[in-house]
Regions:
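Active-site neighborhoods and metal-handling regions in enzymes and metal-associated proteins
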Residues: 1-215
């Protein structure tokens, strides 16, 4: 049976398998951290181009976080030494920044997690370096559609965790795409990675209920 835990904004939390339910102060902290993450990705849009290295992207992301009073949550996390993840083409996720330069037509996912005032804002976005192929562009478009359908499924009253993965998988397979199941989304807040694990495939009306908390 799924356990839920109501969390005060200043309460120490632990990764204990419970799904955390935050109040208005917690949501405000996450909203600020998430907004900063989105602003960083917005700023990187014009920076990502052929010839730029993923290490330079990492440097720019780190500078923007520090300038905003945040720190990169990935820095030092389980031995990781960079400020973001940069995954090019066939790299699914968690690619490591390096001196590798982007090439014309590359698609790259940039994953940033600023830690601002004790709250995490973890998000990623797909970018094109130059002009992508029709095949690459279509992959990114369908992936984005899957994301929005997953969010829509989660937003319905009475939604369950399995509804998210079911919506994502159904749309992807409609266009003959597979769904990666070795990696997943996750809860966050005071903790970088927390319950629940949000897989990208599933059956409707299964899993824990998604509690709608007033934010």
């Amino acid at each position: 049976m799924t356990e839920y835990q109501v969390i005060d904004a200043d309460e120490t939390v632990y990764r204990d398998g419970t799904i955390k339910l935050h109040g208005p102060e917690g949501f405000e902290g996450m909203r600020k951290a998430g907004r900063l993450a989105a602003e960083i990705l917005d700023e990187l849009t014009s920076f990502v181009k052929p010839g730029v290295t993923t290490g330079e992207i990492d440097d720019k992301a780190r500078t923007m976080m520090l300038d905003a009073g945040a720190v990169p949550a990935t820095m030092g996390y389980r031995g990781y030494t960079h400020s973001c993840c940069t995954s090019i083409n066939h790299v699914i996720c968690h690619g490591i920044p390096s001196d590798k330069a982007l090439k014309e037509g590359d698609i790259v996912n940039i994953d940033v997690t600023p830690l601002l005032d004790g709250w995490h804002g973890d998000t990623s976005r797909m970018f094109f370096a130059g002009e992508p192929s029709i095949k690459a562009k279509r992959l990114v478009e369908v992936t984005y559609e899957c994301l929005m359908l997953g969010i829509e499924a989660a937003s319905r009253p009475g939604a369950r965790l399995g509804d998210i993965g079911a919506a994502i998988e159904a749309h992807a397979r409609q266009f003959r795409y597979g769904v990666v199941q070795e990696f997943c989304g996750h809860g966050l807040g005071r903790l970088f990675h927390d319950a629940p694990e949000v897989v990208h495939a599933g059956r409707p009306n299964t899993g824990p209920e998604l509690k709608h908390v007033v934010a």
